[in-house]
């Protein structure tokens, strides 16, 4: 989307030299909002899966089995839960919408809260498991924090929830052996 018709024409002319797919003509405001919408939608979908994992943990239900069964319905496609949301797009872009439209973006705002909380929750789970191990075995556990990046095959740790989890675990470890592994 360009600032006006002429700039849109120039952009399409430029990108059509190397883009194989369809180039869609729109204005710059809609184009920007489209990118924010794509990333916010993903954030909301991830938050739903993460919220289910929190509920299932308290209810004693295997979240993986639950999602697998629910996804057998033809109109259901629940994502897999994780330790939050990372990266410079999905974890950040929703804030552009919520800052400009706070009253209208309740679901987007809540999704950010859920996904941010999930990293805190995971850190607490690891800390509690470490404490339990130490009490039962009278020695400090050896911990491997594996996969700090927010997705496979990248070296980008921006907004990675695993980075937060690792920091919190290291702060509470009292000299436990912690190995940080990024394959």
Report the location of each language-model feature:
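Structural/interface elements that position substrates and couple domains in central-metabolism enzymes
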Residues: 1-183
């Amino acid at each position: 989307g360009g600032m006006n018709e002429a700039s849109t024409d120039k952009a399409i002319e430029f990108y059509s030299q190397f883009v194989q797919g369809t180039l869609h003509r729109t204005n710059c405001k809609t184009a920007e909002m489209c990118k924010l919408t794509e990333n916010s939608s993903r954030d909301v979908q991830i938050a739903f899966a993460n919220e289910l994992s929190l509920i299932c943990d308290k209810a004693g239900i295997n979240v993986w089995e639950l999602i697998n069964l629910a996804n057998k319905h033809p109109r259901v496609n629940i994502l897999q839960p994780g330790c939050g949301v990372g990266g410079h797009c999905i974890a950040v872009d929703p804030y552009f919408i919520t800052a400009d439209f706070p009253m209208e973006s309740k679901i987007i705002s809540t999704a950010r809260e859920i996904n941010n909380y999930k990293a805190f929750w995971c850190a607490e789970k690891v800390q509690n498991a470490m404490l339990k191990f130490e009490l039962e075995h009278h020695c400090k556990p050896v911990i491997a924090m594996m996969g700090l990046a927010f997705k496979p095959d990248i070296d980008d740790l921006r907004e990675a929830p695993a980075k937060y989890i690792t920091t919190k675990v290291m702060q509470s470890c009292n000299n436990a052996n912690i190995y940080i592994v990024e394959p």
